[in-house]
Amino acid sequence: MSPQIKLYLNPPKNNQYYSNHDHISGSVSVDFGKPVSIKQINVSFKGFIETMTKIDPVVMRNQAALMSPMQDAKTIHTLVNIGQKVFPPENVLSAIEGDLKPFQLKEGVHEYEFQLPKVPKKPKCLSSHTKGLMTYLDKDRVRLPPSFNNDWKNMLRFDNLDLFFYSFGKILYMVEVQIELGKPKSWYRPFEKVLTEIQLVEFIPQSKDLTFKLDDKPSKEVLESFKNSNGEQEEKTSNKLQTEKATVPTNAPLVDVMTQKPDVRVYRSTYKIGLPDDDSVMWLEARSPNLRRTFRGDPIFAGGSGKFDDIYIVMMGDKALIDRLRVIPTRVQLNLLETVTYLSQGVANQNVSSLKLAEDRIPLEKRSTVLKNSWGRYVQFSSSNPNQCKWECELRLKNHPNLKKLKFNEEDYRHRGNRLYSFKSCSIKRIFSFQLLVDWDIVGFKRQSEIIVDPIQVFADRNGRNQEEALPLYVPPPSYTESTQY
């Protein structure tokens, strides 16, 4: 009968998942059914990234070669490998000279405690990266990635192709117990036997170590245009309407910056809506200072949240039409878009999915609390034609009775087995985006505005600045038994 190995891990500090400030510790219990020869027992913490990508044969080959199978691209990166020798004890090892000889242990249960070294911040595979290797890493922000797809075995089902392809990338962390037995005396079994016990663990670094660079800062030209030698805003004359924003040259062309508030970003709707005169247009804007980084439990629509609490409907065109036009919001929906990309040997595969965070129809009696034309104001007039103007009005979703209570990921949802967090690693990139949809009734015509905030950073932990002091862990009281003595 082979030895029975049991691995017991002490819970992490947050009692949910291990982080880079935890010292992974626990005990190993080995039950030997008979006397056995043991050379050493090691406990190690290991981490790996594995990605597999498929190449489209239509792209890589001609039509005549489609019948020939193509090899999948597969890549493995070693993130961490730290360990501790729990047997023989350290004082015995220091006294041994020469090669380590096996020890004879008697039958029964033997227990060994361990505490592994602190988890390093940077992945081990960096030293083995070749020059020109394609990765998703930021050069100045290289950290260990979090666990991803620990339940990948449950996704290998052809009845759901989305999950099947989603399982092609994984980041696994594990605690491994390895027992090296002594060499048997039989001539037909000349090699040592190694027994292993593996337990997967969930590892998520602190939010500061998951932060990656976002290209949402205004350029130097924009910053210089905000101020002159007198500290006043420069004025430019033009026959056309001057916008109150300067476009930021980033990867997201719909991101603007307010000239009056440089820290506020303006996220404009994807498309403009044509108004009944076929000349005037309308669009939606979300103005936020910190919409790009979202922690678990952050309010989304509540006033002062800095997310979707400052939304404006903007019209540009004929003043007479804007004065008499009534635009009615009928429905609001907020989605979280996930984009996961796997990279292997220069080939990338992408998986896209959507999560509905909120959906609510605005009842007729509540519409006046969300949008009123009396809240609107004219912000610009054309110098050549006073009838051409720009008008804006706040869409106060923060007054909506249900939306103002919404907090991001309050229930700690797991999407396809993974908590909600974004990250970049050597060969896996997980990015999220917000998608805000607003349905309109414009003089009987149904229209929809869409704002996409791409990308955003999502964190699994709560914002430390807003997090209240946690209560101590509950410790059950000792149990007592009553006995009567005569």
From Swiss-Prot:
Organism field: Zygosaccharomyces rouxii (strain ATCC 2623 / CBS 732 / NBRC 1130 / NCYC 568 / NRRL Y-229)
One Pfam family recorded for the sequence: Arrestin_N
Primary localization: cytoplasm
GO cellular component: a single term: cytoplasm
Name of the protein this chain belongs to: Arrestin-related trafficking adapter 10
Family from the record: Belongs to the ART10 family.
Origin superkingdom: Eukaryota
GO BP, sorted A to Z: endocytosis
Residue intervals passing through the bilayer: none
Chain's gene name: ART10
Function according to Swiss-Prot or TrEMBL: May regulate endocytosis by recruiting RSP5 ubiquitin ligase activity to specific plasma membrane proteins in response to extracellular stimuli.
Alphabetical UniProt keywords: Cytoplasm, Endocytosis
Annotated compartments: Cytoplasm
